[in-house]
Regions:
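Glycan-processing catalytic domains of CAZymes
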Residues: 1-297
Length: 297
Protein backbone atom coordinates (compact mmCIF):
# COMPACT_ATOMS: atom_id res chain seq x y z
CA UNK A 1 0.00 0.00 0.00
CA UNK A 2 1.78 3.13 -1.24
CA UNK A 3 0.93 6.46 -2.79
CA UNK A 4 1.97 4.99 -6.14
CA UNK A 5 -0.24 1.95 -5.61
CA UNK A 6 -3.11 2.88 -3.26
CA UNK A 7 -5.58 0.36 -1.92
CA UNK A 8 -9.34 0.55 -1.58
CA UNK A 9 -11.93 -1.81 -0.15
CA UNK A 10 -15.66 -2.19 -0.60
CA UNK A 11 -17.70 -4.08 1.97
CA UNK A 12 -19.39 -7.34 1.04
CA UNK A 13 -22.11 -7.99 3.59
CA UNK A 14 -25.37 -7.14 1.84
CA UNK A 15 -27.99 -9.15 0.00
CA UNK A 16 -26.09 -8.86 -3.27
CA UNK A 17 -24.36 -11.81 -4.85
CA UNK A 18 -20.95 -12.32 -3.27
CA UNK A 19 -18.31 -10.47 -5.24
CA UNK A 20 -20.78 -8.56 -7.40
CA UNK A 21 -19.23 -5.21 -6.54
CA UNK A 22 -15.80 -6.51 -7.60
CA UNK A 23 -17.05 -8.12 -10.79
CA UNK A 24 -18.48 -4.85 -12.08
CA UNK A 25 -15.37 -2.80 -11.27
CA UNK A 26 -13.60 -1.27 -14.28
CA UNK A 27 -10.69 -3.52 -15.23
CA UNK A 28 -8.10 -0.80 -14.65
CA UNK A 29 -9.14 -0.46 -10.99
CA UNK A 30 -9.31 -4.12 -10.00
CA UNK A 31 -5.63 -4.40 -9.10
CA UNK A 32 -6.13 -1.71 -6.43
CA UNK A 33 -9.29 -3.17 -4.88
CA UNK A 34 -10.45 -5.84 -2.45
CA UNK A 35 -13.80 -6.79 -0.95
CA UNK A 36 -14.69 -7.49 2.65
CA UNK A 37 -15.18 -11.19 3.27
CA UNK A 38 -14.35 -14.04 5.57
CA UNK A 39 -16.13 -14.88 8.78
CA UNK A 40 -15.49 -12.12 11.26
CA UNK A 41 -18.66 -10.32 10.25
CA UNK A 42 -22.30 -11.44 10.17
CA UNK A 43 -21.50 -15.14 9.85
CA UNK A 44 -21.68 -16.37 13.42
CA UNK A 45 -18.90 -17.91 15.53
CA UNK A 46 -18.96 -21.45 14.10
CA UNK A 47 -16.54 -22.81 11.52
CA UNK A 48 -14.42 -19.68 11.32
CA UNK A 49 -11.47 -21.32 9.57
CA UNK A 50 -13.67 -23.09 7.05
CA UNK A 51 -15.67 -19.95 6.27
CA UNK A 52 -12.58 -17.84 5.75
CA UNK A 53 -10.83 -20.40 3.58
CA UNK A 54 -13.98 -21.03 1.55
CA UNK A 55 -14.13 -17.32 0.84
CA UNK A 56 -10.47 -17.31 -0.17
CA UNK A 57 -11.16 -20.10 -2.66
CA UNK A 58 -13.62 -17.86 -4.52
CA UNK A 59 -10.57 -16.09 -5.93
CA UNK A 60 -11.51 -12.50 -5.09
CA UNK A 61 -8.94 -10.19 -3.49
CA UNK A 62 -10.35 -9.86 0.00
CA UNK A 63 -9.91 -8.41 3.47
CA UNK A 64 -10.76 -10.35 6.62
CA UNK A 65 -12.05 -9.16 9.97
CA UNK A 66 -10.50 -10.92 12.98
CA UNK A 67 -12.09 -9.04 15.85
CA UNK A 68 -14.41 -6.28 16.90
CA UNK A 69 -15.47 -4.63 20.13
CA UNK A 70 -16.90 -7.79 21.74
CA UNK A 71 -16.45 -11.54 21.48
CA UNK A 72 -19.86 -12.26 19.93
CA UNK A 73 -22.82 -9.90 19.57
CA UNK A 74 -25.96 -11.40 18.03
CA UNK A 75 -23.76 -13.46 15.73
CA UNK A 76 -22.67 -10.27 13.99
CA UNK A 77 -19.35 -9.37 15.59
CA UNK A 78 -17.04 -12.31 16.13
CA UNK A 79 -13.53 -12.54 17.54
CA UNK A 80 -11.46 -15.10 15.65
CA UNK A 81 -9.17 -17.15 17.96
CA UNK A 82 -5.48 -16.45 17.40
CA UNK A 83 -4.56 -20.00 16.25
CA UNK A 84 -7.30 -19.80 13.63
CA UNK A 85 -6.21 -16.30 12.64
CA UNK A 86 -2.63 -17.48 12.12
CA UNK A 87 -3.75 -20.46 10.07
CA UNK A 88 -5.74 -18.13 7.81
CA UNK A 89 -2.78 -15.77 7.39
CA UNK A 90 -0.46 -18.67 6.61
CA UNK A 91 -2.79 -20.40 4.14
CA UNK A 92 -4.93 -17.83 2.33
CA UNK A 93 -3.80 -17.09 -1.23
CA UNK A 94 -5.97 -14.07 -2.03
CA UNK A 95 -6.03 -12.29 1.34
CA UNK A 96 -4.82 -8.69 1.00
CA UNK A 97 -5.25 -7.24 4.51
CA UNK A 98 -6.71 -7.68 8.00
CA UNK A 99 -9.03 -5.00 9.32
CA UNK A 100 -9.78 -4.03 12.92
CA UNK A 101 -13.12 -2.34 12.39
CA UNK A 102 -14.96 -0.35 15.10
CA UNK A 103 -12.86 -1.96 17.80
CA UNK A 104 -12.95 1.00 20.23
CA UNK A 105 -9.47 0.36 21.58
CA UNK A 106 -8.92 3.87 22.91
CA UNK A 107 -11.53 3.57 25.64
CA UNK A 108 -10.62 0.11 26.92
CA UNK A 109 -9.23 -0.49 30.40
CA UNK A 110 -5.48 -1.05 30.57
CA UNK A 111 -5.91 -4.73 31.55
CA UNK A 112 -8.67 -5.55 29.04
CA UNK A 113 -7.87 -8.93 27.47
CA UNK A 114 -8.77 -7.60 24.00
CA UNK A 115 -5.72 -5.31 24.24
CA UNK A 116 -3.48 -8.38 24.22
CA UNK A 117 -5.43 -9.84 21.33
CA UNK A 118 -4.97 -6.59 19.41
CA UNK A 119 -1.21 -6.64 20.00
CA UNK A 120 -0.91 -10.22 18.80
CA UNK A 121 -2.99 -9.66 15.67
CA UNK A 122 -0.71 -6.75 14.74
CA UNK A 123 2.33 -8.97 15.34
CA UNK A 124 0.86 -11.78 13.23
CA UNK A 125 0.21 -9.38 10.38
CA UNK A 126 3.85 -8.30 10.56
CA UNK A 127 5.01 -11.93 10.63
CA UNK A 128 3.12 -12.77 7.44
CA UNK A 129 3.59 -9.43 5.70
CA UNK A 130 -0.13 -8.60 5.66
CA UNK A 131 -1.29 -4.98 6.21
CA UNK A 132 -3.32 -4.32 9.36
CA UNK A 133 -6.01 -1.69 8.82
CA UNK A 134 -6.93 -0.06 12.14
CA UNK A 135 -10.22 1.52 11.12
CA UNK A 136 -12.21 3.39 13.74
CA UNK A 137 -14.01 6.63 14.44
CA UNK A 138 -15.55 8.26 17.46
CA UNK A 139 -18.72 6.48 18.49
CA UNK A 140 -19.45 8.80 21.42
CA UNK A 141 -15.76 8.76 22.33
CA UNK A 142 -12.67 10.45 20.96
CA UNK A 143 -11.36 6.98 20.24
CA UNK A 144 -8.62 7.44 17.65
CA UNK A 145 -7.07 10.31 19.57
CA UNK A 146 -7.00 8.14 22.70
CA UNK A 147 -5.30 5.21 20.95
CA UNK A 148 -2.25 7.19 19.86
CA UNK A 149 -1.61 8.38 23.43
CA UNK A 150 -1.52 4.93 25.04
CA UNK A 151 1.71 2.88 25.07
CA UNK A 152 -0.26 -0.37 25.36
CA UNK A 153 -1.08 0.20 21.69
CA UNK A 154 1.57 2.55 20.37
CA UNK A 155 4.52 0.36 21.37
CA UNK A 156 3.44 -2.54 19.16
CA UNK A 157 2.12 -0.27 16.40
CA UNK A 158 5.41 1.59 16.16
CA UNK A 159 7.39 -1.67 16.07
CA UNK A 160 5.25 -3.00 13.21
CA UNK A 161 4.41 0.34 11.60
CA UNK A 162 5.44 -0.86 8.12
CA UNK A 163 2.30 -3.03 8.20
CA UNK A 164 -0.05 -0.63 9.99
CA UNK A 165 -2.59 1.65 8.31
CA UNK A 166 -4.43 4.01 10.66
CA UNK A 167 -7.79 4.89 9.13
CA UNK A 168 -10.63 7.22 10.13
CA UNK A 169 -14.05 5.55 9.86
CA UNK A 170 -16.46 8.43 9.38
CA UNK A 171 -19.30 7.07 11.48
CA UNK A 172 -20.15 10.39 13.15
CA UNK A 173 -20.29 13.98 12.01
CA UNK A 174 -18.95 15.32 15.31
CA UNK A 175 -15.30 15.29 16.35
CA UNK A 176 -14.07 14.87 12.77
CA UNK A 177 -11.17 17.27 13.27
CA UNK A 178 -9.82 15.26 16.19
CA UNK A 179 -9.99 12.09 14.09
CA UNK A 180 -8.20 13.67 11.14
CA UNK A 181 -5.63 14.97 13.59
CA UNK A 182 -5.24 11.53 15.15
CA UNK A 183 -4.47 9.70 11.92
CA UNK A 184 -2.11 12.46 10.81
CA UNK A 185 -0.41 12.41 14.21
CA UNK A 186 -0.02 8.63 14.07
CA UNK A 187 1.62 8.93 10.66
CA UNK A 188 3.90 11.78 11.70
CA UNK A 189 5.00 9.98 14.86
CA UNK A 190 5.77 6.66 13.18
CA UNK A 191 2.91 4.81 14.86
CA UNK A 192 1.48 3.97 11.43
CA UNK A 193 3.26 3.53 8.14
CA UNK A 194 0.24 4.74 6.17
CA UNK A 195 -3.12 6.36 6.81
CA UNK A 196 -6.58 5.95 5.33
CA UNK A 197 -10.15 7.17 5.14
CA UNK A 198 -13.35 5.11 5.25
CA UNK A 199 -16.46 6.88 4.03
CA UNK A 200 -19.65 5.86 5.77
CA UNK A 201 -23.07 6.91 4.59
CA UNK A 202 -24.39 7.41 8.12
CA UNK A 203 -22.12 10.43 8.49
CA UNK A 204 -24.39 12.63 6.38
CA UNK A 205 -27.50 11.40 8.12
CA UNK A 206 -25.91 12.41 11.40
CA UNK A 207 -25.07 15.81 9.92
CA UNK A 208 -28.67 16.38 8.80
CA UNK A 209 -28.45 15.59 5.08
CA UNK A 210 -31.28 13.11 4.61
CA UNK A 211 -35.05 13.09 4.11
CA UNK A 212 -35.47 16.85 4.46
CA UNK A 213 -32.17 18.66 3.93
CA UNK A 214 -31.05 20.30 7.15
CA UNK A 215 -33.43 18.30 9.32
CA UNK A 216 -31.64 16.33 12.00
CA UNK A 217 -33.19 12.95 12.79
CA UNK A 218 -30.57 11.59 15.16
CA UNK A 219 -27.89 9.00 14.64
CA UNK A 220 -28.92 6.00 12.48
CA UNK A 221 -32.29 7.55 11.71
CA UNK A 222 -33.77 8.55 8.38
CA UNK A 223 -32.85 7.38 4.89
CA UNK A 224 -29.15 7.80 4.22
CA UNK A 225 -29.55 6.73 0.59
CA UNK A 226 -31.03 10.13 -0.22
CA UNK A 227 -27.69 11.90 0.06
CA UNK A 228 -26.40 13.42 -3.20
CA UNK A 229 -24.09 11.06 -5.11
CA UNK A 230 -21.11 13.40 -4.97
CA UNK A 231 -21.10 13.31 -1.16
CA UNK A 232 -19.66 9.78 -1.31
CA UNK A 233 -16.55 11.00 -3.10
CA UNK A 234 -16.42 14.20 -1.07
CA UNK A 235 -15.90 12.17 2.11
CA UNK A 236 -12.69 10.75 0.67
CA UNK A 237 -11.17 14.09 -0.30
CA UNK A 238 -9.76 14.94 3.17
CA UNK A 239 -7.81 11.71 2.95
CA UNK A 240 -6.32 12.81 -0.33
CA UNK A 241 -5.22 16.12 1.17
CA UNK A 242 -3.58 14.24 4.08
CA UNK A 243 -1.70 11.79 1.88
CA UNK A 244 -3.86 8.74 2.63
CA UNK A 245 -3.05 5.62 0.61
CA UNK A 246 -6.02 3.52 1.79
CA UNK A 247 -9.65 4.31 0.94
CA UNK A 248 -12.73 2.37 1.90
CA UNK A 249 -16.45 2.56 1.27
CA UNK A 250 -18.92 1.06 3.72
CA UNK A 251 -22.21 -0.03 2.26
CA UNK A 252 -22.01 -1.54 -1.21
CA UNK A 253 -25.80 -1.69 -0.93
CA UNK A 254 -25.82 1.89 -2.17
CA UNK A 255 -22.73 1.67 -4.39
CA UNK A 256 -24.15 -0.95 -6.75
CA UNK A 257 -27.66 -1.56 -8.04
CA UNK A 258 -29.55 -4.17 -10.00
CA UNK A 259 -29.68 -4.00 -13.78
CA UNK A 260 -32.42 -6.29 -14.98
CA UNK A 261 -32.86 -9.47 -12.96
CA UNK A 262 -29.39 -10.88 -12.35
CA UNK A 263 -26.82 -8.24 -13.26
CA UNK A 264 -25.33 -5.34 -11.33
CA UNK A 265 -23.97 -1.92 -12.13
CA UNK A 266 -22.55 0.90 -10.07
CA UNK A 267 -25.01 3.45 -8.74
CA UNK A 268 -24.46 7.23 -9.07
CA UNK A 269 -22.74 7.14 -5.66
CA UNK A 270 -20.48 4.32 -6.83
CA UNK A 271 -19.63 6.07 -10.08
CA UNK A 272 -18.65 9.23 -8.20
CA UNK A 273 -16.39 7.21 -5.90
CA UNK A 274 -14.76 5.27 -8.75
CA UNK A 275 -14.22 8.42 -10.79
CA UNK A 276 -12.34 10.03 -7.91
CA UNK A 277 -10.19 6.96 -7.31
CA UNK A 278 -9.33 6.64 -10.99
CA UNK A 279 -8.31 10.29 -11.15
CA UNK A 280 -6.14 9.92 -8.04
CA UNK A 281 -4.35 6.93 -9.54
CA UNK A 282 -3.95 8.12 -13.13
CA UNK A 283 -2.75 11.59 -12.19
CA UNK A 284 -0.66 10.56 -9.16
CA UNK A 285 -2.51 13.00 -6.91
CA UNK A 286 -1.65 11.48 -3.52
CA UNK A 287 1.01 13.73 -1.98
CA UNK A 288 4.22 12.38 -0.49
CA UNK A 289 4.61 12.43 3.27
CA UNK A 290 7.24 15.16 2.98
CA UNK A 291 4.79 17.37 1.06
CA UNK A 292 2.12 16.92 3.72
CA UNK A 293 4.51 17.58 6.60
CA UNK A 294 5.76 20.68 4.82
CA UNK A 295 2.28 22.18 5.08
CA UNK A 296 2.12 21.81 8.87
CA UNK A 297 2.94 24.91 10.84
Amino acid sequence: ITREHPFFTIFDHSIHRTGAEYDVLPEDLKEYAAIMGGAGWSNGPEGLLEKNMSFDELGYPWVTHFFSHAEVIDGKYVIVPLPVAEQILASAKNLKAVVGLEIYMGVRAEDDWVNRLYQRVVMLCGKYGIPFLHTDGNRNDIDLAAVIRRPVFTDVLREYSDYVVFSYKQNHANASYSCYGAILGAWMDGIAGNIGIQAENWYWNDAGFCDDIGGYHGYLQGNEQQIPAVFSAQMLLPGLSLGACYYSMEGEGWLIQMRGTDEYEYSPQGIAMLSLLRMMIQHHLIPAKEEVLGQIR
